[in-house]
Amino acid sequence: MSAVKNAEGTQKLSVFKMTWPIFIEILLQMMVGNVDQFMLSHYSQHSVAAVGNANQIINIVILALSVISMAATILIAQHRGAGNREKVAEVCTVALLANMVFGVIISAALFIFDGFFLSLLDVPSDIWAEASLFLRYIGLFIVVQSAYISFISFFRGYSLLKITMITSVVMNLINIAGNCILIHGLGPIPSLGVLGVTISTNTSKVLGLLLILYFFHKFIDIRLSLKYLRPFPKSTLYKILYLGLPSGGESLSYQISQMVIMRFVNVMGIVVITTKIYAYIIAMFSYIYSQALAMATQIIVGFLIGAGDLDAVEQRVWKTIRIAVTISTTVTLLLFFNSDSIYGIFTDNPEVLELGRHIFLIEVFLEAGRAVNMVMVMSLQAAGDIKWPVTTGLVSMWSVATLGAWFFGLHLGWGLVGVWLAMCLDECLRALVFIYRWKSEGWRKNNLLE
């Protein structure tokens, strides 16, 4: 009965109160990468293209690290809903260990084999050196990022979302200050360009990790301990991987498909490359609040399922979808009607401005589908319904988005407009499939706590 009461209390919490700190946190996390490119845009367009290409690989790595962390957040929320504090501590310990091991391996791979990864993108020779520099030295600090992402997931599972927001604010301020000094130089400090970006970005990550460790010991009432690893809790690791690998596969598949699409774009010339990169940065403002809504809903869904209140889950998910679609569509329309002014922040190139207008007309429909997908995927994950998101994602992302980008963009010669049309069709098709799955109520049959 106490679990049900706890669930009712959680349901009464304003989703807005959970969403806005997540929104600010995600915005600032994305800005760590995008601020780099914005500030570099006043230094060199080639540097923007170099960092944009390297970030395609970094984004895949971050998503791979988020696989375990996302699963940890769901399990923490469910065990909290069921009132099992010891299991929460065990999940946190196992998740951190797994992510740290993975982080060390990835850091070494990116530093040593940077050339191999860049060749997969067919990076142009005139931006290769800067892309390699950025990938190697940002990659070297991925192990720091893996620990940071793990602790962020613990705070989300505990619904302590303002803490993660504060940490992101501090990290972003450090990164911006470092860029201001190091990109163009200041006084005796020379202009370092892309190297300066890597220094300020990595410094902000290290200090961010130290801050989140302090907050963990101050605000969370569990302690990580080796006792939870003796004997090793294979069942807990299995549940983390059961949730994380397929769920992460959906996101990972998306990023890999985007990497292939970037390869198509790279043969279209520097104007198209920079337009795509700027469009991605601007598009972030269309979907970021919907992503925050989806993440807040995932935490609530996990808690409610742990408490056994499935009817409340149903109501919460549909309400979130309506809000997410409305907000994403409204913001994208505003961006479309003001596209010249917004692109003008980055460049005055008339070719980029014209191409950007065409892209954002398609973006209106793309973002409506993406809003549905984000809420549905995270809700299905929280319910333990893992196979549908990853299967649908794999099929649609590759057969519609990637193949379509080649067909419309290169084969028919529609360029970046054709690429965006294919990605729009992918998002809308997946949205319809996920709506069908949720209405079938197959998600109600899963139980991760047994």
Regions found by a protein language model. Name each.
Residues 27, 31-49, 118-125, 181-192, ...:
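Helix-terminus/linker motif at the lipid-water interface of multi-pass membrane proteins
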Residues 69, 138-157, 164-172, 197-212, ...:
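Short runs within selected transmembrane alpha-helices of multi-pass transporters and secretion channels
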Residues 1-22, 76-143, 189-245, 301-366, ...:
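Short alpha-helical transmembrane segments in multi-pass integral membrane proteins
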Residues 40-59, 126-130, 194-196, 236-243, ...:
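Interfacial/gating helices of multi-pass transporter permease domains
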Residues 48-108, 145-159, 163-164, 262, ...:
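Small-residue-rich hydrophobic transmembrane alpha-helices
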Residues 29, 33-36, 40, 62-69, ...:
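Alpha-helical transmembrane segments and their lipid-water interface positions
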Residues 17-36, 137, 171, 204-208, ...:
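Transmembrane helical elements of multi-pass membrane transporters/channels
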Residues 22, 26, 37-38, 74, ...:
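Transmembrane alpha-helix boundary and packing residues in multipass membrane permease domains
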